[in-house]
Curated annotation (Swiss-Prot):
Organism: Methanosarcina mazei (strain ATCC BAA-159 / DSM 3647 / Goe1 / Go1 / JCM 11833 / OCM 88) (Methanosarcina frisia)
GO molecular function terms noted in the UniProt entry: 3'-5'-RNA exonuclease activity; RNA binding
The protein's name in its UniProt record: Exosome complex component Rrp41
Biased composition (Acidic residues): 297-377, 401-471
HAMAP family hit by this protein: Exosome_Rrp41 (MF_00591)
Gene: rrp41
Amino acid sequence: MSNKPENLTLITDDGLRLDGRRADEIRPMKIEVGVLSRADGSCYLEWGRNKILVGVFGPREAHPRRSQRADSAVIRYRYNMASFSVEDRARPGPSRRSIEISKVSREAFEPVIMAELFPKTAIDIFVEVLQADAGTRTAAINASSIALADAGIPMKGLITSCAFGKVDGKIVLDLNKEEDNYGEADFPVAMTQDGEITLIQMDGNLTPDEIKQGLELVKKGCKEILEIQQAVLRKKFETPVEEVSEETAPEKGAEKEVLEPSPVAAIVEETPEEAEEPEVEISEEVEAEILASEVIPDFEDELEEEIEEELEESEEDLETEEEEFEEEALEEEAEPEEDLEEDLEEDLGEELEEEEEELEEEEFEEEALEEETELEASLECAPELKEFDEIEARLEKEDASIEAEEEIEPEAEEATEEGLEEEAEIEETAASEEENIEAEAEAEEEAEPEVEAEEISTEAEEAEEEPEEEKSEGPWKVVKDPSEAGTRGEKDE
């Protein structure tokens, strides 16, 4: 809200506003139902200089799938202002204001739409502002309510919306463009036909008493709007009852004229400024043809094309969002997959190594079996090779003994040296014994008669030695010199 020029008077001393209305009056409203053939429900609304077109699609399958709800339908409300709707060209596409209005308008309809009857579906409401003149959000809500009813969406009741504001210190109903620009406050409200408020906003400063006064005006204005909405819907969906009788054609025509509902409730008189111009009385049929030829054809094709383009753009945006979401999900999945791949590669490497070792062992065993089979075959063909096997076994034993000796070499070297010394001593003793034996043999040959005497002497010596052995104490035994035993044996011989 900007500063008001000094020479601008919004309310006169008589209580009239710039457009000739009183403080508690709404602007004239005109509603057309079913203006879009491709939409499930549609409405064209003119409220003052506001021109709103609404199309409703659904219930239909919700895309993307992740936006579905298992217990109810998803309500999607899209408010958009055409670039030619204001004096300064509006930037096409969604803005912060349009997003905010879409959100609050959707929340205004959620309490009355029976979304639980259509789970996993979507109800799309597309609002296109063709010409803006203050109060576009309230006008869009009124038109959307009619379009939902035209689409056959189950609702607990119609939604009506109106706004009040503060202008020159006075509370007025349904602000126009100048009052909205230079007024002190703006207070839009939406409510059900039972008086339950579903939307309430405020821009500016108001006291509690002013709010109470304004809400009373809003209730009055919403009641008038509800009557217009009901009259328009009744006019479309009610069919005149034709009585079958033998009446004349003029009388039947008169009955039809009586049965047709009056459109006065749907089309309110125009503003005083426009009423000053001379009016030409025309019939209702001509008026309907004029409206169909001037208003609807001028906008229907263009608006349908614009709505289709916007739908395509919104679908493309949704597809791009889905792709981005899928890419993010794939990236998130790729990180653990990389770790898993590394772990799998390590596990596979270990398994491959084990498999290679097993294969090598199997190949070695197969080669050994083949060699054994070849040897067995050769043995069957040539029994002489059995000796070769025995020789191989002996050689293996000798190899094993050699390996054992090599392991014991450091310890056995000393033992071998000692054994060699003992062998040398034994050889010396053996040589000396041989010499003694030779000498004894010569002596025996020379003195055979003396043998008996020596035997007797030896027996006596043995008898003397035996008691000595018995006298030996302890566990130790007396070992005799083998050299003596040899000499004694030789003597015995």
